[in-house]
């Protein structure tokens, strides 16, 4: 049974009802643009998102573009329906359209984000500002990838149809495993998927252009494109390390406003040694995921008698609740996890020496009492001067914003080209 996690849909705007997908001459599987684009149309749309409503002269100052260039881009984006003018906000005595403020025309449209987790799949509807309109969680279907993805697409289509006045523009899928962004094909060992046609099946099921990305890379992109902190931009040459931990662990690197996306797919930190005695499926002991994943922590809690045996496997929520309610053994097992995470982040930070480090995922955000232990272990293990290290501002919603940014990244990077794809 699906469980809504955010606010109920806002029924605004004037776009046509989301209908059963019509036949298309070809599928649009488009690699995501996990970067801050320097194109003029992208720059104008970005400043409209962050500062709108605003005038053209303010937009020119904010983007560094000439007034003439801003006028051309605003006119093009107005014609495409991505911007709207606010004549009601025109200063008294102002003459001519250049004085009329403009903003993102967010009410007629939505995008569909899908985060496919090992256990739960989240489906998210967002507007063009990157604001989440609503979200729903469904169990990730088990079995053959084609059947599972068809079911996910069906659920996503039904969910998006709740906003009957909004026109869906794009779908974005974020998930673990090895992702070929060009083709939308994914290998996901945890789900048993080999050459899963993620892009093709979701595009067919929704009748929309679709982009597919590795989920940790997408989380890093959400910090660049959707975080309030991103409004000030990224310093030239600035580097970042994004570290994620929950059921899996992973990292992504950002360089100069762009997520580094290796052509052969993201690397893995699953088997980094931690020194623990946890048995890994690879045959070794002490591998990172075998030590800190939700599944590993629950198993350790069961072995220690912290959580009761039952017909249904306990959840992390039960462990967090026990620790928050004063269970010293539950707290201790979460502290041990926090210490391993802190040491691992320190090792990676010393290796890459980025300008900033962002920690994301429920392993950090679900148990705030563990954060001081992450920080202490990090400080003890790192040999470099401390810089900007923080927890993601998206909190427990990092998965939602990861898929949201995949659904929006191409529109943000090339608004004109993206809108042409949506109408072809």
Locate predicted features.
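ATP-binding/phosphotransfer module of carbohydrate and carboxylate kinases, centering on a glycine-rich
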Residues: 1-89, 93-153, 157-158, 228-235, ...
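Short clusters of small/polar residues that mark proteolytic maturation junctions
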Residues: 88, 137, 191, 264-265
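Short glycine-aspartate micro-motif
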Residues: 101, 111-115, 168-172, 240-244, ...
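Short, acidic, Ser/Thr-enriched surface-loop or helix-capping motifs
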Residues: 127, 181, 254
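Glycine-rich phosphate-binding loop and adjoining helix at the ATP-binding site
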Residues: 132-239, 369-379
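Short secondary-structure boundary segments
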Residues: 175, 245-247, 294, 361-362
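Glycine-rich phosphate-binding loop of actin/hexokinase-like ATP-binding domains
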Residues: 236-291
């Amino acid at each position: 049974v699906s469980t809504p996690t955010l606010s109920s849909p806002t029924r605004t705007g004037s776009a046509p009802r989301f209908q059963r997908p019509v036949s298309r001459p070809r599928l649009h599987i488009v690699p995501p643009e996990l970067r801050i684009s320097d194109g003029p149309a992208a720059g104008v749309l970005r400043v409209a998102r962050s500062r709108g409503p605003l005038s053209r002269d303010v937009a020119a100052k904010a983007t560094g573009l000439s007034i003439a260039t801003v006028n051309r881009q605003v006119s093009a984006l107005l014609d495409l329906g991505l911007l709207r003018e606010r004549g009601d906000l025109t200063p008294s005595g102002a003459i001519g359209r250049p004085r009329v403020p403009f903003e993102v025309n967010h009410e007629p449209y939505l995008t569909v984000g899908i985060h496919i987790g090992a256990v739960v799949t989240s489906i998210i509807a967002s507007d063009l500002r990157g604001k989440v309109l609503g979200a729903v969680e469904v169990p990730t279907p088990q079995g053959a990838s084609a059947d599972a993805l068809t079911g996910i697409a069906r659920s996503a289509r039904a969910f998006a149809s709740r906003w009957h006045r909004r026109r869906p523009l794009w779908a974005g899928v974020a998930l673990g495993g090895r992702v070929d962004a060009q083709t939308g094909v994914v290998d996901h060992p945890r789900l048993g998927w080999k050459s899963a046609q993620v892009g093709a099946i979701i595009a067919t099921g929704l009748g929309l252009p679709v982009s597919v990305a590795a989920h940790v890379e997408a989380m890093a992109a959400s910090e660049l494109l959707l975080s309030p902190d991103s409004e000030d931009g990224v310093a030239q040459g600035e580097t970042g390390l994004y570290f994620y931990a929950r059921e899996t662990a992973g990292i992504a690197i950002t360089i100069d406003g762009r997520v580094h996306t290796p052509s052969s797919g993201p690397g893995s930190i699953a088997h980094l040694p931690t020194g623990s005695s946890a048995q890994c499926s690879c045959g070794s002991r002490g591998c990172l995921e075998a030590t800190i994943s939700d599944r590993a922590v629950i198993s350790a809690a069961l072995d220690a008698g912290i959580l009761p045996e039952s017909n249904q496997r306990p959840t992390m929520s039960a462990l967090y609740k026990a620790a928050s309610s004063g269970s010293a053994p539950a707290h201790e097992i979460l502290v041990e996890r926090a210490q391993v995470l802190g040491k691992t982040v320190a090792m990676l930070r010393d290796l890459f020496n980025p300008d900033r480090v962002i920690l994301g995922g429920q392993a950090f955000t679900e148990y705030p009492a563990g954060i001081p232990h992450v920080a202490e272990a990090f400080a003890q293990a790192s040999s470099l001067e401390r810089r900007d290290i923080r927890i993601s501002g998206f909190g427990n919603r990092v998965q939602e914003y990861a898929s949201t940014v995949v659904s929006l990244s191409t529109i943000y990077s090339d608004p004109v080209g993206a809108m042409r794809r949506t109408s072809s």
